[in-house]
């Protein structure tokens, strides 16, 4: 299996960028990235070998690995000075560099996933960076998660430092998730310690993206960003600060989370979009790709969606997973990443590697 040319991609800021943002010089991957997602727990477990087998026997050519546990605690032992200062007493993955070496030995690439603005663990160490309610206690979304202020310089620097840590460990790409404001819960009760409440949320997220491009991308570290699937439709920031054309220039790849189960009833005429995986993704990508095509060529990132491989809204089958992959291919996507929170993927949906 050929290792995608992720580590070889250039992410150099150019001086001829349009006003208001910096553009990236991009080099296309040698082949589309086809990845599956692993939690820190799965990476540390005996099941890790089964994912290495996927790299050797199937079309999968990359593994996406969380750098943080679900609560935000670092899931590994840091090696760089800025992150060592935040090292936990215990960590889930005991031998992360060795795991990365094993991925490379199997012919795959390693992608580090960083959940940025949703992080309970960091908020406990730096309470001044967390969103709060009027009484001063941490604000929580509808699921109970704590969020950090997207306008906080310390929080943004932490993301930059983690990206540098990932590159030092040997990861080929850094994937940034939760680069947005909260979308649910008692939003009007949030007290922001840094955001002034008047700067548009899209501008706050844009400033984060610009910092990543400058402090991470220009150092030759390949980057990708996860965005709501509906960002390929919505013309505004959807109240969370994610606007397609605004974010596009700053990352090598955008990863819209086009899980059909996450679309509301009635989308594209479907009572239950989860039961129409090809159509939902086809229409989403077609719409977004047209918008991206209107940008200057140097501002167009690769599009590599997150696809659904879990049961929500419908019981997913091999054929339904495969249908999503076909929709990506039909719309010129640069591969895909499969999401299953417990790492149980439909192996029959993954084509065998050609000899």
How would you describe each model-predicted region?
Residues 29-43, 117-168:
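Active-site-adjacent "subsite" loops/lids of carbohydrate-active enzymes
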Residues 34-42, 80-93, 143-157, 195-203, ...:
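The substrate-binding groove and active-site-proximal loops of carbohydrate-active enzymes
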Residues 37, 109-119, 175, 201-240, ...:
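Aromatic-lined carbohydrate-recognition surfaces of secreted/lumenal glycan-active proteins
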Residues 47, 53-58, 102, 144-179, ...:
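An active-site-proximal structural segment forming one wall of the substrate-binding cleft
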Residues 49-73, 167-173, 250-253, 328-336:
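Catalytic domains of carbohydrate-active enzymes, especially glycoside hydrolases
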Residues 61-67, 94-140, 175-177:
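Glycine-rich, aromatic-flanked loop segments that form ligand/cofactor-binding clefts
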Residues 75-87, 119-142, 182-196, 242:
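Aromatic- and acidic-residue-enriched segments that line the glycan-binding/catalytic groove
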Residues 251-264, 274-355:
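Substrate-binding cleft of secreted/luminal carbohydrate-active enzymes
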């Amino acid at each position: 299996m050929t290792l995608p040319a992720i580590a070889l991609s250039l992410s150099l800021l150019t001086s001829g960028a349009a006003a208001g943002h910096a553009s990236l010089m991009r080099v296309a991957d040698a082949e589309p990235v086809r990845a599956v997602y692993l939690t820190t727990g799965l990476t540390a477990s005996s099941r890790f070998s089964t994912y290495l087998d996927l790299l050797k026997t199937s079309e999968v050519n990359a593994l996406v690995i969380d750098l943080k546990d679900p609560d935000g605690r670092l899931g590994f032992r840091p090696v760089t000075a800025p992150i060592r200062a935040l090292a936990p007493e215990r960590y889930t993955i005991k031998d992360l560099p060795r795991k990365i070496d094993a991925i490379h030995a199997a012919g795959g690439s390693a992608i580090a996933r960083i959940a940025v603005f949703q992080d309970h663990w960091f908020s406990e160490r730096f309470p001044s960076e967390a969103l709060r309610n009027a009484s001063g206690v941490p604000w929580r979304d509808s699921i109970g998660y704590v969020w950090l202020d997207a306008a906080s310089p310390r929080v943004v620097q932490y993301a930059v430092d983690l990206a540098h840590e990932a590159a030092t460990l040997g990861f080929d790409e850094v994937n940034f998730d939760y680069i947005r404001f909260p979308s649910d819960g008692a939003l009007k009760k949030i007290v922001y310690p840094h955001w002034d409440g008047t700067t548009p949320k899209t501008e706050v997220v844009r400033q984060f993206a610009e910092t990543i491009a400058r402090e991470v991308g220009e150092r030759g570290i390949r980057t990708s960003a996860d965005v709501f699937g509906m960002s390929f439709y919505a013309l505004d920031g959807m109240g969370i600060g994610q606007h397609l054309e605004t974010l596009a220039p700053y990352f090598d790849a955008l990863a819209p989370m086009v899980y059909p189960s996450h679309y509301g009833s009635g989308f594209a005429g479907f009572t239950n979009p989860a039961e129409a995986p090809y159509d939902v993704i086809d229409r989403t990508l077609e719409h977004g790709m047209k918008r991206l095509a209107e940008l200057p060529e140097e501002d167009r990132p690769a599009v590599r969606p997150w696809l659904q491989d879990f049961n929500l809204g419908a019981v997913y089958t091999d054929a339904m997973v495969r249908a999503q992959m076909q929709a990506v291919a039909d719309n010129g996507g640069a591969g895909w990443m499969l999401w299953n929170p417990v790492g149980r993927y439909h192996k029959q949906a993954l084509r065998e590697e050609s000899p």
